[in-house]
């Protein structure tokens, strides 16, 4: 494969670009009027690349085996593309109303002149293609993980309705959808990331005399990652007779400094509200 030598210099990769393309024996089956500079074309056809590459599974496996051999770190950023498989859902996520500032909402909105705002004439068939793409993509994420590959969690936020903080938690959910155990996902999001960045002091987890970088959560994320969302979750009260709102990161401790996350969320909400009338 032509990727063999190039992969030696590829210490980390983000997204999924280049992996399925490298497995194809030729060019992707683009229509004759395809224009990469037209982002509707670009992202519409991106929905078919993994399905096409999946016809050459042994070649895909060779690409991944070369990445594994070279100890390449992979940051898939599944969350930022999720709007392609369910556009109306990501546009109406419950945190947007309170926590997405007007200027960012305008940047998200479809516009031919802005990157990653290509959702005009986005079709049912496009979403179906992307759903299939995710199934195959996740299968290879699991293969990479099962064979010793290092994954990290990123979100590439501020595009396609992916909102800071919330999108990272959604990325953890998508790793779980790919078949990875929540304990391993926490490692992907924490110590794996520090090792990749060269933060050796922070890469060994919680231990005595280590830097106090902790998140204190109202709930058990190993049971349900949704308890980490700032919007929280609904659950039965202890007596089982009513619904209560709980969850969310209560406190963040960074370098020994304690931050009240609920207070910070209130400040964000107040700022977002202040921008609505301008």
Q: Across the structure, where does each feature detected by a protein language model lie?
A:
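C-terminal helical cap
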Residues: 119-129, 134, 139, 147-150, ...
């Amino acid at each position: 494969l032509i990727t063999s030598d190039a992969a030696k210099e590829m210490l980390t990769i983000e997204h999924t670009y280049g992996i399925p393309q490298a497995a194809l024996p030729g060019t992707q089956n683009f229509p004759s009027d395809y224009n990469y500079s037209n982002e509707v074309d670009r992202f519409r056809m991106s929905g078919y690349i993994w399905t096409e590459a999946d016809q050459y599974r042994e070649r895909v496996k060779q690409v991944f085996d070369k990445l594994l051999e070279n100890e390449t770190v992979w940051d898939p950023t599944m969350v930022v593309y999720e709007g392609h498989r369910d556009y109306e859902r990501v546009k109406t996520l419950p945190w947007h109303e309170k926590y997405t500032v007007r200027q960012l909402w305008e940047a998200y909105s479809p516009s031919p002149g802005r990157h990653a705002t290509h959702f005009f004439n986005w079709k049912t068939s496009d979403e179906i293609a992307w759903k299939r793409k995710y199934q195959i993509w996740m299968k290879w994420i699991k293969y990479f993980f099962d064979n010793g590959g290092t994954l990290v969690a990123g979100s590439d936020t501020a595009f396609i309705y992916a909102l800071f903080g919330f999108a990272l938690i959604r990325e953890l959910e998508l790793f779980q959808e790919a078949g990875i155990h929540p304990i391993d996902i926490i490692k992907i999001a924490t110590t794996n990331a520090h090792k990749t960045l060269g933060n050796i002091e922070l890469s060994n987890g919680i231990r005595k005399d280590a830097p106090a970088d902790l998140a204190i959560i109202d709930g058990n994320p190993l049971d349900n990652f949704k308890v980490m969302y700032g919007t929280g979750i609904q659950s039965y009260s202890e007596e089982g007779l009513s619904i209560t709102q709980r969850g969310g990161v209560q406190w963040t401790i960074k370098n020994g400094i304690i931050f009240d996350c609920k207070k910070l969320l209130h400040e964000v909400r107040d700022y977002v509200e202040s921008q609505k009338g301008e």
